[in-house]
Amino acid sequence: MDMTKQIVDFEIKSELIGEIDQFEASDYTMAPPEEPKMVEESPQLGHLEDQNRKYSPEREVEPTLQDPSEVVDQMQKDTESVGEVKSPEKDVETELVKSKASPMNDQALTPPPRPLTSSEVVGLRDPEHTELRMCLEAKKSRSLPVSPQPQPNLKLAGSALFEFGQRSSPVETKIKTNPETKPPRRKIVPPSGEGQQFCLRWNNYQSNLTNVFDELLQSESFVDVTLSCEGHSIKAHKMVLSACSPYFQALFYDNPCQHPIIIMRDVSWSDLKALVEFMYKGEINVCQDQINPLLKVAETLKIRGLAEVSAGRGEGGASALPMSAFDDEDEEEELASATAILQQDGDADPDEEMKAKRPRLLPEGVLDLNQRQRKRSRDGSYATPSPSLQGGESEISERGSSGTPGQSQSQPLAMTTSTIVRNPFASPNPQTLEGRNSAMNAVANQRKSPAPTATGHSNGNSGAAMHSPPGGVAVQSALPPHMAAIVPPPPSAMHHHAQQLAAQHQLAHSHAMASALAAAAAGAGAAGAGGAGSGSGSGASAPTGGTGVAGSGAGAAVGSHHDDMEIKPEIAEMIREEERAKMIESGGHGGWMGAAAAATGAASVAADSYQYQLQSMWQKCWNTNQQNLVQQLRFRERGPLKSWRPEAMAEAIFSVLKEGLSLSQAARKFDIPYPTFVLYANRVHNMLGPSLDGGADPRPKARGRPQRILLGMWPEELIRSVIKAVVFRDYREIKEDMSAHQYANGQGHGTYIGGGTTTNGYHSAAAAKLAAQNAALAPPDAGSPLSSMTETLRRQILSQQQQHQQHHQQQAHHQQQPSHHQQQSPHAQSMNMYKSPAYLQRSEIEDQVSAAAAVAAAAAKHQQQQGERRGSENLPDLSALGLMGLPGLNVMPSRGSGGGSGGAAPNSAASYARELSRERERDRERERERELSRQYGSQSRGSSSGSGSAKSLTASQRPGAASPYSAAHYAKHQASAYNKRFLESLPAGIDLEAFANGLLQKSVNKSPRFEDFFPGPGQDMSELFANPDASAAAAAAAYAPPGAIRESPLMKIKLEQQHATELPHED
């Protein structure tokens, strides 16, 4: 390079300035130092421009001078952000040249030997803008026209030329590929008088280049895009793809992410592979039957050489492509802006220009405009507003506007073929983050939308957008108000509606929103496929005809880079699906999308559950990685943001443990993601420790419900404290008085709501009635489970209070101390089991039995202890026990009412039943012990079931005060020690089975298995053994499986019945 440079310098000095007019400005004749910025400007000036513009000579001169330098500069800019490095002499020379050149340069451009390819064609067209006219004719491979970056890259030939002179630092030269090899075809006049230049040409440059590209493809070196279809993928180079296909060019241009993954739908893998090979090598072999499909795909993807790509585009070939360097992210926006300009501008000046080019302008010309503007704004030196912008906004705004590659008209179809998936790690393009973009974006919106109507919206939007902070976050806040109304605006507006959306929607979370909106908009039919497609509003342009596909840009400017924006038409189906979710509820859910909601001010449109939306949003983020890096990383690692409130989780777990909902039912009911719920519920279940009923699952697992249910009974305080520990870790205390906290939707769970009066879940008719009532009362619009819960809670408590009062009146004579109603004795609470409706038949029996037993026992005990006074305070709270519709009890018994039968006198039916069952129980135990000893021959066996029997016989004579079973029972079932302790805290004489005899009548009709309770030959409720202990033992032996260690008073009935009948059914 150095040598080259020297040669060049030498030439520069030696060439005559006079020759300048023959050449296009060479880079040596670079713009003077003041202009370095401009210089970057427009490598892309093109013939288009030439055609459409009348330029004055001076203007031309300048461009020519600057042009190459611009190219160079741009490249430079791309590579290093430094300004041009020129040596002072050169600067001087350039000035000279400039002054002299200006008169002559006018004619100086050598006409290119062939029409320029699109890369050359794109030019800046602003009159005010000094345009450099660059017709580099460096040898170009026609097959590789241009990529969005190409201006700089592909012009390498030209730029490189210029580079020699221009750059003093070798570094710069290295940017160009082999500058030496590029033949400067035009003579370049060095500013100094030494007039001669040498053309260094690399003869097999093109073939070399293609070979190199192919090698890079094979080795996957420097690849920056992945194309995938049918489960296969191939890594390629954006530059090559863009050069060979305006479609890709536009696509990359719109989605400037570091390594996009493009998922091609409707493209077969063989075709894709063949096309890539074609783009890299320029030739492929295909069988005849493959040709048509291949050409069809090539047509869709606009592959040069296989499809008619440049037809109809500006003069030189497919100029429509956004020829831009990636660094200008705003191009798309500009593009749009240009389109808009076209359409909306009243300014005569731009209008005329447009008229000339209009046909191609729509998509393509726009490009030029944008580019020109873009460049200007980029350089900053030309920041003056160009009249062509609507309202005279400055280019900046143009930049913001969403320009999309012109290809859109033909494109929508193509677009559908690919989905860009953002590479999660691609860094966002920083530039867009600048605040200015938001302004631009606003502008863009106005501009882009074809009709004035759009501008209205866009303004609204833009205001919002403007403030949005560069990060994607702001976007969300920017949701334009009109967005709130889902009603789609007229198409033109629509499209831009979408755009805005897109813009807004950059926020990762907002995605769903936007897409839903866009979908709504698009779906509205305005945009049609193109519109629907890009959430980012690009679709909207379909109506415009111009920018359809690429529209994504406008919004992009707003918050983060386009990456964020990218819902491409390809994702239309997703969007459509989201239409179902209508629009994300803007309002309620936490700060989540609160900002957006606030901005939109719209009433939230209730959609599918919040959970669903969240999930879909997350899904979308996952699929398109459209979030800023942080969010996206977070999303990928940790799943969607937490969407449930701890209260809901607590209620859900309660409802599982008490109402017996399955985990999935509870998760759905409380809108908690199932996996999360399972984790929490199982944690709670594990921490609860052994169940009161002795642990083993009382319901055999049938095929239908594997382990999706948590079974067992625990004292309620225990459950509550565990849930508190698990769910409300440190940050939240569930109030001690649970009555404030109502678990389970509006159903009070016995003990803690409304004192003891609440019914237990749905367990009894009254409860069911109450539940229905609550459901009916619950405000229809209740926004969140929380509010509806509190509402139902309030109502429920009221109704309970009323009922409570009635009870008091009815039963005042029973209860001398009503004040104690609220305190339930612990055993009552623990007996308050929550059974699931799934097995109501049995659970109801148990509940009722145990409750009635408790009542009767308490009554009896009291009576024994204080014959004169029946204190209600220690009676168990029946209401908690699901006793509700038992024949002898009032519907909502309050604590002390034993019901007519239970509480009144010892000789009442309850106490009789108690005595009776006690005897039966004792007999059964003895009988059983005998049987066991027969079975095992001796106790030496040490088995828990047989070991204690001798002792236990004596012990059984005096069963513990409260234990309903004889000591023998415990001896045999040591596993129930826990239960035993629990039972000993019970009042003396509770015998569940006794109660079963009298009280179960009620559920006979409900329980198909009622007979199972008394299956023994003669052992039915009427039978009494002479010796009560013997009868109990016998009964036990008859009913319980020999090894059962899980019997406990509460579950005994259930166990026996299971033993008798269910074993055969277990699957």
Swiss-Prot record:
The keyword Nucleus applies. Leg imaginal disk at the central region of the tarsus and in eye antenna disk at the basal cylinder. Residues 391-412, 812-829, 904-914, 934-949 have a biased composition (Low complexity). PROSITE patterns: BTB, HTH_PSQ. The modification Phosphotyrosine is found at residue 55. The modification Phosphothreonine is found at residue 384. Its main location: nucleus. One of its GO terms (biological process) is eye-antennal disc morphogenesis. One of its GO terms (cellular component) is nucleus. The modification Phosphoserine is found at residues 56, 87, 147, 377. It is found in: Nucleus. Residues 525-538, 545-556 have a biased composition (Gly residues). Probably acts as a transcriptional regulator. Required for the specification of the tarsal segment. Also involved in antenna development. PANTHER family: BTB DOMAIN TRANSCRIPTION FACTOR (PTHR23110), FI07618P-RELATED (PTHR23110:SF109). This is Protein bric-a-brac 2. It comes from Drosophila melanogaster.
